[in-house]
Regions:
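Short, low-complexity disordered leader/linker segments with a strong preference
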Residues: 1-44, 377
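Periplasmic-binding protein-like
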Residues: 219-224, 228-231, 235, 265-294
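A ligand-binding cleft/hinge motif common to bilobed small-molecule-binding domains
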Residues: 106-110, 248-268
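Conserved C-terminal helix/tail region of periplasmic/extracytoplasmic solute-binding proteins
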Residues: 30, 343-377
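Extracytoplasmic ligand-binding site segments that recognize negatively charged/polar headgroups
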Residues: 50-61, 73-87, 95-243
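Short, polar/charged alpha-helical segment
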Residues: 31-42, 51-71
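Paired acidic/hydrophobic, glycine-rich loop segments that form the ligand-binding mouth/hinge
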Residues: 49, 93-101, 247-253, 268-269
Length: 377
């Protein structure tokens, strides 16, 4: 017994210091890489970010204050415009943008499919960013099949099809499934934002088209049988809903309905977990990518790691969240007290993740809508 104990202590004495050296080397490795990257970024002097929707993150000045030797410049706008602009610049041989932050659909369809990105995964350096346990479900989310190019840092819970209703015309307790909205008494009383004309309407349409319990069969009945009115004017859609011209709007952006409700209009949304078919998990404008041939590659890495850090994600939630439209980072170590209980993510919930690459292509949905409407003429 004494021999075994002595052998155990001897092994501990021998391997213990080695383990400490390995741990120290590992720590020194990332620290050395980070310090070298920051020094190189300061020599580059600037970083150019194309950012859709979330310009307030940069306007806050926090990054500039933290990294005063790296001037951050940015351009904002609609994702479609920004990605098309980058595409045109690269075709002309101009590589001006370092980092793109914006909606996942335009990022995926234009920049990723156009092969204009470098792997962002290799740009992640800080342990608090690379540590998967800091992220929801213990993993980092990527919106590309390779799991390398489009980092998704936002995960908002939202009602699948983004349906809203007139509270004087409809009792939500009578409708537990999207199929219930095909009730003949609602014929001619449903309006919808037109996916072919409204920017930002893609997420609920992804759900309607790709969700297995709905899909083309449901859309054919909805638009083929229910005399749905299509509109490209979101404000008009909510006004029509509030005045009772229509009983249901699907999809309608939640923030628009929230404002109308607070103004006294008899409108409300179906809560995210209301319908039995499922719940969206969406990133809004919370997708991040590293441009290929970035003019300031080290500064790009510094910005990416900062934004994905606890500080960056806490700031993102703080400056982007609005009443009725909270933003939820996929980081689990940042505050969540601003998010209502019925919009919190739930463990072991089978969400329809709108950032899965197989559901990104909206062209089949638009083609189907054209086909259905053409058949009604």
């Amino acid at each position: 017994m004494k021999f075994v104990m002595g052998l155990f202590l001897l092994v501990c004495q021998f391997f213990g210091p080695a383990r400490l050296v390995i741990a120290a080397d590992s720590k020194a490795s990332w620290q050395a890489e980070w310090e070298q990257t920051v020094r190189a970024a300061e020599q580059e002097g600037q970083v150019m970010v194309s950012i859709g929707g979330y310009g307030a993150i940069i306007d806050s000045g926090v990054f500039q204050k933290t990294y005063s030797k790296i001037k951050i410049t940015h351009i904002t706008g609609a994702g479609t415009d920004l990605t098309q602009r980058i595409s045109a610049e690269q075709r002309a041989g101009k590589y001006l943008v370092d980092v793109y932050n914006g909606g996942g659909n335009s990022l995926f369809q234009v920049l990723y499919q156009g092969k204009m990105l470098d792997p962002i995964k290799s740009a992640l350096i800080l342990p608090e960013v690379t540590d998967a346990t800091k992220w929801w479900e213990g993993k980092q989310k990527y919106a590309d099949k390779e799991g390398q190019y489009i980092f998704v840092y936002e995960g908002n819970v939202s009602a699948g099809a983004g349906a809203a209703y007139n509270t004087q015309l409809l009792d939500p307790r009578e409708y537990k499934s999207y199929w219930d909205l095909l009730n003949p008494k609602l014929k001619g009383k449903i309006l919808s934002t037109d996916i072919r004309k409204v920017r930002g309407a893609g997420i609920p349409w992804q759900f309607l088209y790709y969700y297995s319990e709905l899909g083309p069969k449901y859309l054919r009945r909805l638009f083929g049988e229910m005399d749905v009115t299509l509109t490209a004017d979101l404000r008009q859609a909510v006004d029509w809903l509030g005045t009772g011209k229509f009983a249901v709007g699907m999809p309608i952006q939640g923030g628009t309905v929230y404002k109308a409700k607070n103004q006294g209009l008899p409108v409300d949304e179906f809560s995210p977990y209301h319908f039995k078919e499922g719940v969206n998990l969406s990133s809004a404008f919370g997708s991040l990518a590293l441009m290929n041939r970035a003019p300031h590659p080290n500064a790009a890495k510094v910005f990416i790691n900062w934004l994905l850090s606890r500080e960056g994600q806490t700031l993102f939630q703080k400056v982007i969240s609005q009443p009725g439209d909270p933003r939820n980072s996929r980081r689990i170590d940042v505050p969540k007290d601003h998010i209502p209980p019925d919009e919190q993510r739930r463990d072991k919930m089978n969400y329809f993740d709108t950032d899965d690459p197989d559901t990104k292509d909206l062209n089949p949905a638009m083609k189907l809508l054209d086909e259905i409407l053409a058949g009604k003429k």
